[in-house]
Amino acid sequence: MPDDRYPVPADRHRVTQEIERSRFITTVAPAATLEEARAFIDEVRAEFPDANHNCWAYVVGPPGSTAAIGMSDDGEPHGTAGRPMLTALLHSGVGDIAAVVTRYFGGIKLGKGGLVRAYTGSVQQALETLPTRERVETATLEIVLEYAASKRGQPADQRVRLQLKQYRL
C-alpha cells in the first residue's frame, strides 16, 4: 500500500479481557502527531489512575513506519509490554495509531512469557475489531499572482509565488 493512502483508526476503540484474574483494558485511538499520541496516553492514564500499569505504544505515520514510534512498559519487567505492543502495531497494517493497555493485577504472576503473550494478545484483540477509515495525503498547489501598481512608463512588477501545502484528510 502506498504511503499516501493507508488505514487509520476511525475513532477510539476499547476491548477488555481477563487473563489469570488480571484485567487488561486495551484502548486504541488515532494519533496523527506525537502530540496527539502523548495526549491520548495521558488521558487514558487519568481515566485509570488506580491501575497497576498503563503500558503504551504508538506509531505516527504510515503502517510499519519507524520514523515516529514510542513505547513504555510502565513498571512491568523490561521488554514484556511496550515492545510487544509496538510490534503488534507495526505489523497491523494500520498507521497513525496509539494503544494503551491498562492492567489491574489479579494476584497471579504471569511470568515474562505470559506478560508478552497477554500484552500482544490484548492489542491484537483490539485491532481485530478496530473500525478504520482511509487516510489520503493530498497536495494542494496555490498560485498567487501579485501585480504592483505601476507609474506611467514603468512596467508593472509581476511576481509569482508558488506554495505547496500538504493536507491529511
Language model segments and positions:
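Active-site beta-strand/loop microenvironment that shapes enzyme catalytic pockets
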Residues: 81-129
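Short glycine-/aliphatic-rich beta-strand segments at the starts of folded cytosolic domains
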Residues: 133-149
